[in-house]
Swiss-Prot record:
GO annotations of cellular component type: plasma membrane
One term of GO molecular function: ATP binding
Organism: Brucella abortus (strain 2308)
EC numbers, comma separated: 7.4.2.-
Pfam annotation, one family: ABC_tran
SMART domains in alphabetical order: AAA
Protein name: Putative peptide import ATP-binding protein BAB2_0817
Described function: Probably part of an ABC transporter complex that could be involved in peptide import. Probably responsible for energy coupling to the transport system.
Amino acid sequence: MSRQPILDIEGLRTVFRTRAREIVAVNDVDIVVNPGETVALVGESGSGKSVTSLSIMRLLARKVGFIDAGSIILRGKSGQTVDLAAIDEEAMRRIRGNDIGMVFQEPMTSLNPVYTIGDQIGEPLRVHRGTSRREALEAAVELLDRVGIPDARRRAGQYPHELSGGMRQRATIAMALICNPTFLIADEPTTALDVTIQAQILDLMQKLQSESGMGMLFVTHNLGVVAEIAQRVVVMYAGRIVESGPVKEVFRNPRHPYTMGLLRSMPRLGDATEMKRRGEKLNTIPGMVPGLANLPSGCAFAPRCSFAVEACHAAVPPLASVNEHHGSRCIRWQEIAA
């Protein structure tokens, strides 16, 4: 399998324009995704995860959000590369849904309530390949069966409200994969599902990825999911990457206080009962994610950080190399141990 990246983002900077000023939502982001690899993008709400994925898809609100700098190099099915940050909307439409698929967090908002499931799943084939409606429907039925929806032909004729939450999410996965994309963005695809269905969806996505060899960017705040599905992890805070590296290494040896805080905040089996017995509380990260319009000077995490020193407030730290594959945006990373 080729190890040329499917996706190579360098220096991505995304800006939102308000009446008063321009606000930087994503700043100096670098992400590489290889064929067959899953990279998890994690952080609290407001960290810039979803804006990063919407920037890749070029789905930012028109006249409000725009890519101000950087490149997003995609290697499509033809093997040719294209900079998604530089092409016009017409060219992007030919790529979106064809070379790149996206699974959204809430299927009821990404499925049209007035069209049948089969019509919606088959639409990318009609748009990108000129497939007839009948052929597109047959392909949709086949894919619904592959993603584990029983009685697929009948379900293809139903509307979104007639399916359970788990079935709707399977349908959105089918819609994202119908054109066999080389790259998939999964933006919090299991958040709205119960734990049992969540596990089934994760297993399904891993199976489909294994069969196709596509690269995947998995956006989530759930570190338990990251440990299960991803090979590498990118941690974002206030629009910047603060740590990145192989999942096992970052989880075992985090070198940024924010990553440490996220890991320590994860509830584990048996924790609640034992902590209640001892009169203890679950670990939390003090404070709140700052608003992007009012970021503190220096390191944005410094006001919440127990490791912060005066120098942390003076300038934004560079992303330092812990080793060849592991980076941390902390001037004290060498002193930090979980």
